[in-house]
Regions:
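Basic, Lys/Arg-enriched alpha-helical interface segments
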Residues: 1-63, 71-78, 86-96
């Protein structure tokens, strides 16, 4: 899959250093694998859910959330948000 954009992962990891390794691990797995359909994602990442039009990944032992729009037919993963669990729970990301 082609991940757009890795820059968001790097910026988030700069602010939250403990997120760096789990985010990079996520990036490597996703960028080197073709996932289709959603059930393939669930097999690779047990903690992934569909929330509306977005796919939400639990990252770093449930400390962080990565929210992406995935276009399986185009092999594209668009990172929309990377949040702490507390930021995710506030739900403001749904408004954007």
């Amino acid at each position: 899959m082609h991940v757009i954009t890795k820059k968001r992962l790097i910026e988030f990891a700069a602010e939250y250093p403990t997120a760096r390794d789990p985010l990079l691990k996520w990036y490597v797995v996703v960028s080197k694998t073709d996932f289709a359909p959603f059930s393939a994602l669930r097999s690779a990442f047990g903690s992934v859910d569909q929330v509306g039009k977005f796919t939400v990944f639990d990252i770093g032992g449930n400390k962080y959330r990565l929210i992406a729009a995935i276009h399986f037919n185009r092999r594209r993963v668009y990172i929309r948000h990377v949040l702490t669990h507390a930021e995710y729970d506030k739900g403001k990301w749904k408004e954007k």
